[in-house]
Amino acid sequence: MAPNIRKSHPLLKMVNNSLIDLPTPSNISAWWNFGSLLGICLMTQILTGLLLAMHYTADTNLAFSSVSHTCRNVQYGWLIRNLHANGASLFFICIYLHIGRGIYYGSYLYKETWNTGIILLLTLMATAFVGYVLPWGQMSFWGATVITNLFSAIPYIGQTLVEWAWGGFSVDNPTLTRFFALHFLLPFLIAGLTLIHLTFLHESGSNNPLGITSNCDKIPFHPYFSSKDILGFMLLYFLLTTLALLSPNLLGDPENFTPANPLVTPPHIKPEWYFLFAYAILRSIPNKLGGVLALAASILILFLSPFLHKSKQRTMTFRPLSQALFWLLVTNLFILTWIGSQPVEHPFIIIGQLASLSYFTILLILLPLTGALENKILNY
């Protein structure tokens, strides 16, 4: 009998082992769909981004006009831009749900997979930030100024670092040029890191909602989960096209319809919605360096998750106390997101400070303590 080409061909063999004959736990739920959704988001962003880059000019005098030209005069340019801008929002929705799933079901105990995932998140955040600067609207310019300026809080080398990043003494043409170069490069770095992420995942196999080993009950990925993934793709694209066609500017800032002007500061500088929770944590500390450290800690704290797991059970499926804390954390993140979009005045300042404090308290103190307490309860 002739060997099956998909199992013997050097390249097809890799695809086969990752997407066709991959042994998968039979009980994984829709929460395990987000990995493939992130993959399709990345491919969509690279494709639409490439088409946009063909019509974009990375120059402070022409950037705003070139984006306007793309929307007005290029065939379906408006659609490509709307898909790209809203695709970024869906990318972040998927990655936040993916991380939430990881925390709820204890997936962080696969340390290598988890750590590469956090590096992917940081790279995605950097990509989204430099991309937001490219249309060169008011919020693009002032967002770039405020966020890059945070590096000046680093002792001794801070100011030099900022001027080196800017390529001058303020955000100007060199900044825009290098941000465009970075925005073009980073998605390919994300694609490379994704392969590393998957390599580590396939070393251990997928986790499942029960958190117990599933080697005795695995089924092939295709056709069972490939069909489930395709349903996910259809729902994602339905959501994306609905957003891009019916309310493309829903998640954007009206300030960005005004060309960048270094002489006029917008009344309220804020990043895109997906960074608002971190922005609220940054602003909740009145000291510049303290704020920057809190901002970094809000994401880097995820690296500590495997070490803060004190429960004998992997997932939260049968841990009601931890579940309550998890949903409290989710609610807390919504509050932080809302606070980040509000001006710095009473009562938003104190709400932001309390929400920031509770964010770190839940992750660093309450979840590990609850895990240990639930172990004790198991003995009764």
UniProtKB/Swiss-Prot annotation:
GO cellular-component term (any): respiratory chain complex III
Main location: mitochondrion
Cofactor mode of binding and number, as noted: Binds 2 heme b groups non-covalently.
Cofactor(s) this protein requires: heme b
Residues reported in the UniProt entry to bind a ubiquinone: 202
Keyword ATP-binding attached: no
TM region(s), chain numbering: 34-54, 78-99, 114-134, 179-199, 227-247, 289-309, 321-341, 348-368
CDD domains, per database record: cytochrome_b_C, Cytochrome_b_N
Binding site for heme b b566: 98, 197
Gene3D superfamilies found in the cross-reference section: Cytochrome Bc1 Complex, Chain C
Keywords associated with the record: Electron transport, Heme, Iron, Membrane, Metal-binding, Mitochondrion, Mitochondrion inner membrane, Respiratory chain, Transmembrane, Transmembrane helix, Transport, Ubiquinone
Keyword Mitochondrion among record annotations: yes
Location relative to the cell: Mitochondrion inner membrane
Molecular function (Gene Ontology), one example: ubiquinol-cytochrome-c reductase activity
Further details from the record: Heme 1 (or BL or b562) is low-potential and absorbs at about 562 nm, and heme 2 (or BH or b566) is high-potential and absorbs at about 566 nm.
Subunit structure: The cytochrome bc1 complex contains 11 subunits: 3 respiratory subunits (MT-CYB, CYC1 and UQCRFS1), 2 core proteins (UQCRC1 and UQCRC2) and 6 low-molecular weight proteins (UQCRH/QCR6, UQCRB/QCR7, UQCRQ/QCR8, UQCR10/QCR9, UQCR11/QCR10 and a cleavage product of UQCRFS1). This cytochrome bc1 complex then forms a dimer.
Known role: Component of the ubiquinol-cytochrome c reductase complex (complex III or cytochrome b-c1 complex) that is part of the mitochondrial respiratory chain. The b-c1 complex mediates electron transfer from ubiquinol to cytochrome c. Contributes to the generation of a proton gradient across the mitochondrial membrane that is then used for ATP synthesis.
Record's protein name: Cytochrome b
Provenance organism: Phalcoboenus australis
Gene from which this protein is expressed: MT-CYB
